[in-house]
Amino acid sequence: MEGLEENGGVVQVGELLPCKICGRTFFPVALKKHGPICQKTATKKRKTFDSSRQRAEGTDIPTVKPLKPRPEPPKKPSNWRRKHEEFIATIRAAKGLDQALKEGGKLPPPPPPSYDPDYIQCPYCQRRFNENAADRHINFCKEQAARISNKGKFSTDTKGKPTSRTQVYKPPALKKSNSPGTASSGSSRLPQPSGAGKTVVGVPSGKVSSSSSSLGNKLQTLSPSHKGIAAPHAGANVKPRNSTPPSLARNPAPGVLTNKRKTYTESYIARPDGDCASSLNGGNIKGIEGHSPGNLPKFCHECGTKYPVEWAKFCCECGIRRMIL
């Protein structure tokens, strides 16, 4: 090939050889330089040029990476036809109910309950939730079901093994008998009045004895709290807590025995100094405070329970009043 002159220079024209990688043609001298460079660029992936980053350089504009588009979740097939049919059935059932109410005939049966197929049913409580709520609820309901089952096992174990206190105590059965030696009657449990007891002023002794016996028989039907109130009237040695003024004791009301509740509330009046006494039909009876702790029993004569404190007046288990030795 002959050389050609261009712009005062000589350019050699020879045979052009193609590149094996990109397919372009080069002179043999240039192809030696192009070969390794083209091979390197082909094996190495070229980075995309971000023009916005280059424009933001030297300015206050922050360079934010572009957000990648999220793939849209697949759409579920809509159940609009089923929902439409359920809606029509509900309207027809409501119209039939209104017509039956107007005519006064028999009410039609309610339509069957409908469930949304898109909801997920909880295996523990059988309720239905959407996907987001079901993921949170099922774990919570699982823990709740485990706790309830554990509580049920614990309650059955405690029922199978009752406490010793419930095994020891048995409430006494109220039995009436004519024999004087039995201790089942309420009057025999209370201390009997001694011969040196105080007599009521202005009232015959026969009436006092009859009233005390009638009160002793009525103690069986009263609650433990009423027994504690009525017990001081049965014996002369028992000293109740509350008192009445001497003026009330000298002039007793005629309807004391007829109205028990009124008698109990009005006949007990506490003094500010702490000493108490009670009156029934004008008679004064001393309380437990006057006795020393040595004269009082430590255990209940009815159920055998020990009194928690020395000044206890009633049994904390059965409610029977504490006797005096």
UniProtKB/Swiss-Prot annotation:
Keyword Chaperone found: no
Cofactor dependency: Zn(2+)
UniProt binding sites for Zn(2+) 1: 19, 22, 34, 38
Stretches the record annotates as Disordered: 43-83, 150-260
Residue positions, PTM Phosphothreonine: 244
PROSITE patterns: ZF_C2HC_C3H
Pfam families the record matches: zf-C2HC_2
InterPro entries named among the record's database cross-references: ZC2HC1A/B-like, Znf_C2HC_C3H
The entry's keywords: Metal-binding, Phosphoprotein, Repeat, Zinc, Zinc-finger
Coiled coil: none
Binding site for Zn(2+) 2: 122, 125, 137, 141
Biased composition (Low complexity): 177-188, 197-216
Zinc fingers (C2HC/C3H-type), renumbered ranges: 15-44, 118-147
Residues bearing PTM Phosphoserine: 223, 292
GO terms, molecular function: zinc ion binding
Basic and acidic residues bias locations: 48-58
Family membership: Belongs to the ZC2HC1 family.
Protein name, per record: Zinc finger C2HC domain-containing protein 1A
Organism of provenance: Homo sapiens
